[in-house]
Amino acid sequence: MRNLILVGPMGAGKSTIGRLLAKELRLPFKDSDKEIELRTGANIPWIFDKEGEPGFREREQAMIAELCEADGLVLATGGGAVMRGENRQALRAGGRVVYLHASIEQQVGRTARDRNRPLLRTADPARVLSELLAIRDPLYREIADVVIETDERPPRMVVLEILARLAELPPR
C-alpha cells in the first residue's frame, strides 16, 4: 500500500480517524487543508475570502498532487477535493481510498462550532451539507476502495473496521 487516503464530507471524522490510523500503522499523518495553511501562512477562511473558492481549489489540487506522490502516509483530504477530476485521479493513483460516510445530522453536530468552514457560513448549514453530499457522494464512491459508516461510532471502532476491510482487499 502506497498511502491510505481518507475522503468524505465535512464532519465525517477524516482528521480524527486519520490521526488514529497513522498511529496504529506507524505512518506520518497529513491533512491536505492543514498543509495548505502551513504553506500559505493563512487559514482556509482567509484564503476563501481573498481568492474565492476557485483560488483555494487551485491550491488544493497542487497540494493533493504533491501529497499523493509520497509513499507511506495517511492523508485526510478536504470534503470538496473530489470535485476536480485531476484530484480524483491523483487520489486513486496515490493509494487505497477510504470513504468515511456520515449522515447530515452527524455532520451538522460535528461542525456546528467550527468557524473554520467557509462553506457553512450560512443560516442553514444542514441544507448546504445536504446539497454538497448529493453532489459529492457519487464522486467519493467512484474512487473509494471501501466505504465506512462513521455515524455514532467511536473513532477506535472505525479504525479497526478500516484495517479489517483493507486487509480483505486484493493487491492492486
Curated annotation (Swiss-Prot):
Family the entry assigns: Belongs to the shikimate kinase family.
HAMAP family: Shikimate_kinase
Complex formation: Monomer.
Entry binding sites for Mg(2+): S15
One Pfam family cited in the UniProt record for this chain: SKI
Superkingdom of origin organism: Bacteria
Keyword list, A-Z: Amino-acid biosynthesis, Aromatic amino acid biosynthesis, ATP-binding, Cytoplasm, Kinase, Magnesium, Metal-binding, Nucleotide-binding, Transferase
GO biological process assignments: amino acid biosynthetic process; aromatic amino acid family biosynthetic process; chorismate biosynthetic process
InterPro entries per UniProt: P-loop_NTPase, Shikimate/glucono_kinase, Shikimate_kinase/TSH1, Shikimate_kinase_CS
Gene Ontology annotations for the cellular component aspect, listed alphabetically: cytosol
Protein name from the UniProt record: Shikimate kinase
Record keyword Transcription regulation present: no
Pathway participation: Metabolic intermediate biosynthesis; chorismate biosynthesis; chorismate from D-erythrose 4-phosphate and phosphoenolpyruvate: step 5/7
Main subcellular location: cytoplasm
Cofactor note: Binds 1 Mg(2+) ion per subunit.
Any GO molecular function: magnesium ion binding
Enzyme class: transferase
Residues reported in the UniProt entry to bind substrate: D33, R57, G79, R136
Keyword Membrane: no
Cofactor (UniProt): Mg(2+)
Organism for this UniProt entry: Pseudomonas savastanoi pv. phaseolicola (strain 1448A / Race 6)
Cell compartment(s), UniProt: Cytoplasm
Function: Catalyzes the specific phosphorylation of the 3-hydroxyl group of shikimic acid using ATP as a cosubstrate.
